[in-house]
Amino acid sequence: LPMWKTVEEVENFLRTVAGKCKTTLLLETREAVECLDEVLKHGDMDEIHIGLNDLHLSYGLDFMFELLSNGIVEKIVKKIKRTGIPYGFGGIARLGCGDLPAERIIMEHYRLGSSRVILSRSFCNNDLISDLSEVENVFRNNMRLLREYEDTVSKMPDSEFVSNQAEIEKIVEKIVKMKRRKR
């Protein structure tokens, strides 16, 4: 269910689906964050994805990853985590890419207990590749690199995640300042 804003919208959605298929709530609005406690009491959804792009716009922020640096995502996932409902957030670029490097975002996924993510277009941009077999090769290679990095991250000590969180705050602040100067 995308762009929901009220408990009633979620209730109607879950009642309509009635267990016929897997349900995912896309938490993408400020209003959804504000009524999340009530929505989570229902517990009938299969998973929740926090959509950073629409959510940052809903909050009037300049950069979607401000939601990581300002604590909003952490506040949301703490609530979801208590319910046991699987969750994830945002999207990631391929390793070595992104205004905020994908490696840093992946570390935040691990720190926050996320179990799912959407891959951004830059992960495998099929607009730049016309040969379907080449798209498949690029995707497969990027997935292999991602899984290898995940394995490395899964073995990191907590201190690495604390350092990463602080570095994300610095990088996001710098990006936001640049965006505001361009206005």
Question: Each predicted region: which residue ranges?
Answer:
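Ligand/cofactor pocket segment of small-molecule handling proteins
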Residues: 22, 29-33, 42-53, 58-59
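Hydrophobic faces of well-ordered beta-strands that scaffold small-molecule active sites
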Residues: 1, 23-28, 48-50, 87-91, ...
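Catalytic cores of alpha/beta
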Residues: 9, 30-43, 93-114
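Alpha-helix-loop-beta-strand connector modules within alpha/beta enzyme cores
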Residues: 10-24, 67-90, 140-158
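Active-site-adjacent beta->alpha loops and helix N-cap segments on the catalytic face
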Residues: 1-19, 32-35, 57-76, 98, ...
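C-terminal helical cap(s) of enzyme catalytic domains, especially alpha/beta-barrels
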Residues: 60-69, 110, 123-180
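Active-site-adjacent structural elements that line small-molecule/cofactor binding pockets in enzymes
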Residues: 50-53, 66-69, 78-81, 85-101, ...
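Single conserved hydrophobic/aromatic residue that forms the stacking wall/gate
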Residues: 183
